[in-house]
Every structure is written in structure tokens, then in C-alpha cells.
Amino acid sequence: MQVILMDKVVNLGNLGDVVKVKDGYARNFLIPTGRARRATQANMEAFAAQKAELERIAADKLADAQRRSEKLEGASVTISQKAGVDGRLFGSITNADIAEALQAQGHDVAKADVRLPDGPLKALGEYPVVLSLHSDVSANITVVVVGEQ
């Protein structure tokens, strides 16, 4: 299926690109989330009329993500969790826990922004974590997991 991208989509294309994707990906994800429209003649003309506005919105989103990245870069967040004698946690620290701790510090971070490539944190220590704030902007923070008494 041919679609017009209404936003930058990672590993697919930029705003305004006409790309061919599988029908299910378009029908079940791209179109319902507003990231794409079918590439019909009417939609192509409507997109051409809206292109300047959509580019301005995309630039605003990018500027906001860069501003948030500057505030978050190098930040450290401490999370306490019950742990055993060997340093392994009873439970784990997930991306939702990290996002919640950052929100408590006053940062605007959603749990989908937190990237844990090795899965949840399951031991005490310091961990580097990447926050993907935009498809072009990321911030590196440090998560310190300490044991509760």
C-alpha cells in the first residue's frame, strides 16, 4: 500500500515522503495513529495544501525535544528497591519506574521515551539509560539503583 507520511517515522521516511508499506502496517498502525494517509490523488492535494503547516509543527516538536534533551542530558536519578544480600533486586526496575522517577524530579518524560535495550534492571548499581525524546533527539542519563533498608 502506498502512503504519505504525515510525520517522520523511524526506519521508514520523513514528512511528505510517499512510501510503500505492507497493508497491515498501514491499516493497523500508521493510519490510525495519524502518522500516514493513503496516497490517493485527493490526499496528495490536501497534503500539498497543508505541507507548510505540518513542517512548522514538526519543527516545533523537534525544538521542544532538543530543549528537553538539554535539560536531561547527564542527569542522574536514584531509585530504591528492596534487594537481597547478593545485590539482586526483588522485582525489577522498568522503563515506567524510571519515567515516574524523572517526572517526580520535574522532567516531562513518558515511559515510551525510556529505552532499556537489555530489559529491566535487576541488580543494584549504576546504569546508563538512553531517552529517545524524538526520532532525531536522544538524551543520556544515569540511573542509580540502591537497596532499601
From Swiss-Prot:
One of its GO terms (molecular function) is structural constituent of ribosome. Coiled coil: none annotated. Keywords: Ribonucleoprotein, Ribosomal protein, RNA-binding, rRNA-binding. Pfam families: Ribosomal_L9_C (PF03948), Ribosomal_L9_N (PF01281). The keyword Protein biosynthesis does not apply. PROSITE patterns: RIBOSOMAL_L9. The keyword Ribosomal protein applies. InterPro entries: Ribosomal_bL9, Ribosomal_bL9/RNase_H1_N, Ribosomal_bL9_bac/chp, Ribosomal_bL9_C, Ribosomal_bL9_C_sf, Ribosomal_bL9_N, Ribosomal_bL9_N_sf. GO terms for biological process: translation. It comes from the Bacteria. One of its GO terms (cellular component) is ribosome. Belongs to the bacterial ribosomal protein bL9 family. Binds to the 23S rRNA. This is Large ribosomal subunit protein bL9. It comes from Thiobacillus denitrificans (strain ATCC 25259 / T1).
